[in-house]
From Swiss-Prot:
Protein keywords: ATP-binding, Chaperone, Nucleotide-binding, Phosphoprotein, Stress response
Similarity annotation: Belongs to the heat shock protein 70 family.
NCBIfam families: PRK00290.1, prok_dnaK
Keyword Disulfide bond applies: no
Name of the gene: dnaK
Function in brief: Acts as a chaperone.
Name the UniProt record assigns to this protein: Chaperone protein DnaK
Biased composition (Low complexity): 594-614
Lineage start: Bacteria, Bacillati, Actinomycetota, Actinomycetes, Mycobacteriales
């Protein structure tokens, strides 16, 4: 069995954490950073870039770079078309998860097979199922889907080690907002209530800065930058940077040279100064949207502000001073806890939950809730709720319904999620039919409908005719838009791409090695011209040119062959130098050895586990020392 990790799959950044010796450790990625940008790019040469490398090339590859895909997960109408192939949000998310998995495996030195993945507390069933599908496509066994505020409270609460504490988690990420109230005591983490807004996050603050900049530029130059994709990508990056700087400075300069050109093809520059006061003014309505969910959570939990013991801020967007000030205002002046890293605490909690599920962490029980009510459509289009929001999960509820018409042979069960009174105003999760109902006057048949929500928050619905015993069940996964066959296909596709990526990386290593060998060999020849005959120099140069020529093409075997030839000529050069120096009684064998060694190193694959580095011992000297 491989290792289990906790993953915070974020809108802007993602984090992976693992338990080591019972303590959670955040794993740095291959670039050395503890957070990985949730960005995926398809380069023109077919390479798939993930993380910082994808983010770095976004300006020059706008149409083939995908960011903030989390905002689309669970939406089966969304996809991105790259080279005539459509990718779903699950597939793009899987690319991010694959990188986190690879980086964790590199750090641990062993396979990672299992994961707990976090989602916003206010994610719908479709979004949860889609996230689980993404994990499966990435080659992970998803142990549990956990709400982000719950994971944060788990990490924070266990660290504090206090009894009976009420924690408010205010989670403002890159694309979503959640607020949750939890009670922690004696190893039990129980969610009392949760609320939020899946369409509110740091991206919206960035967009306000972008809008402000485009308006300013249009006023100054009469040019609409929104029609220029490359300019807009530069503006988005500048806006994010400005937002971050305004968390610690009163103002920031936004300077973008050569942002576009005028009618006469003269380059134009964007140069603006944005103050924190102005930034807060243009984003005040976004901040105010977090007030209602906060008040709703208190109401649903039936507690007052004074009952809150600790306030935990989660998500990079909570670093904005205006957010901190609002939270203090809403909580009656309580100072938010500064002891947790808002970017990492969710992944840490996920790793702890993975430890709980794998039996590595004892005496911890996590009791989460369903964020939205679940029910079915009944006569007149009414939403009849079977499970109210903020019900602790896993849970199971049943209710008996009847037919609306005489001799009705079947009933259509339509499952909805939401808080509106009319079913059509809520989110349709799925539908199925129960047939074979015995003929009877309306109101006589008894149809028992059972809702079963598992620990991942994923819904199973069963309808049973008590008279005939006929039964039908649906696992609500339609919302993710993927059948098991599609998921299996995507898993195979992801595995194939992993092989492609590995092959491409190996090919690049061959190229790098070849280029290095040509450079080192030519440098050696240049440094030792007087000691190497012209005939040998010509042979070495001819072989080096062969490598140069091979590097112009795509035939890796041809490059390897050319490298082997150059390696052989280099070793001949080294041999010639040894013989020449021996004849002259010289002591420059080290230089000759360098020539041969350079050829041998560059022409061989050092990945062979049976090859070891060793010092060369002079046998005569060795005997003299005895």
């Amino acid at each position: 069995m491989g290792r289990a990790v906790g993953i915070d799959l974020g809108t802007t950044n993602s984090v992976v954490s693992v338990l080591e010796g019972g303590d959670p450790t955040v794993i740095a990625n291959s670039e050395g950073s503890r957070t990985t940008p949730s960005v995926v790019a398809f380069s023109k040469n077919g390479e798939v870039l993930v993380g910082q490398s994808a983010k770095n090339q976004a300006v020059t590859n706008v149409d083939r770079t995908i960011r903030s895909v989390k905002r689309h997960i669970g939406d089966d109408s969304w996809n991105v078309d790259i080279d005539d192939k459509k990718y779903t949000a699950q597939e793009i998310s899987a690319r991010i998860l694959q990188k986190l998995k690879r980086d964790a495996e590199s750090y641990l030195g062993e396979d990672v097979t299992d994961a707990v993945i976090t989602v916003p507390a206010y994610f719908s069933d479709a979004q949860r199922q889609a996230t689980k599908d993404a994990g499966q496509i990435a080659g992970l066994n998803v142990l549990r889907i956990v709400n982000e505020p719950t994971a944060a409270a788990l990490a924070y609460g266990l660290e504090k080690g206090e009894d009976d504490q009420t924690i408010l988690v205010y989670d403002l990420g890159g694309g979503t907002f959640d607020v949750s109230l939890l009670e922690i005591g004696e190893g039990v983490v129980e969610v009392r209530a949760t609320n939020g807004d899946n369409k509110l996050g740091g991206d919206d603050w960035d967009q306000r800065i972008v809008d402000w900049l485009t308006d300013k530029f249009k006023s100054s130059h009469g040019i609409d930058l929104t029609k220029d994709k490359m300019a807009m990508q530069r503006l988005r990056e500048a806006a994010e940077k400005a937002k971050i700087e305004l968390s610690s400075s009163q103002q920031t300069s936004i300077n973008l040279p050569y942002i576009t050109v005028d009618e006469d093809k003269n380059p134009l520059f964007l140069d603006e100064t944005l103050s924190r006061t102005e930034f807060q003014r243009i984003t005040q309505d976004l901040l105010d949207r977090t007030r209602k969910p906060f008040q709703q959570v208190l109401s649903d939990a039936g507690i007052s502000v004074s009952d809150i013991d600790h306030v935990v801020l989660v998500g990079g967007s909570t670093r904005m001073p205006a957010v901190t000030d609002l939270v203090k205002e809403l909580t009656g002046g309580k100072e938010p806890n500064k002891g947790v890293n808002p970017d990492e605490v969710v992944a840490v909690g996920a790793a702890l939950q993975a430890g709980v599920l794998r039996g590595e962490v004892k005496d911890v029980l996590l009791l989460d809730v369903t964020p939205l009510s679940l029910g079915i459509e009944t006569k007149g289009g009414v939403m009849t709720k079977l499970i109210e929001r903020n019900t602790t999960i896993p849970t199971k509820r049943s209710e008996t319904f009847t037919t609306a018409e005489d001799n009705q042979p079947s009933v259509q069960i339509q499952v909805f999620q939401g808080e509106r009174e009319m079913a059509s105003a809520n989110k349709l999760l799925g539908s199925f039919e129960l047939g074979g109902i015995a003929p009877a006057p309306r109101g006589i048949p008894q149809i028992e409908v059972t809702f079963d929500i598992d620990a991942n928050g994923i819904v199973h619905v069963t309808a049973k005719d008590k008279g005939t015993g006929k039964e039908n069940t649906i696992k609500i996964q339609d919302g993710s838009g993927l059948s098991q066959d599609e998921i299996d296909r995507m898993v195979k596709d992801a595995e194939a791409h992993a092989e492609e990526d590995k092959k491409r990386r190996e090919e690049q290593e061959v190229r790098n090695s070849a280029e290095s060998m040509v450079y080192q060999t030519r440098k050696f020849v240049d440094d030792n011209k007087e000691k190497v005959s012209q005939d040998i120099q010509d042979k070495v140069e001819e072989a080096a040119k062969g490598v140069d020529e091979a590097l112009k093409g795509d035939d890796i075997e041809a490059i390897k062959s050319a490298v082997e030839k150059l390696s052989a000529e280099s070793q001949e050069m080294g041999k010639s130098l040894y013989e020449s120096e021996a004849a002259n009684g010289g002591t420059t064998g080290g230089a000759a050895g360098a020539a041969g060694a350079a050829g041998a190193d560059a022409g061989s694959d050092n990945s062979d586990p049976n090859v070891v580095d060793a010092e060369v011992v002079d046998e005569d000297k060795k005997d003299d020392d005895k």
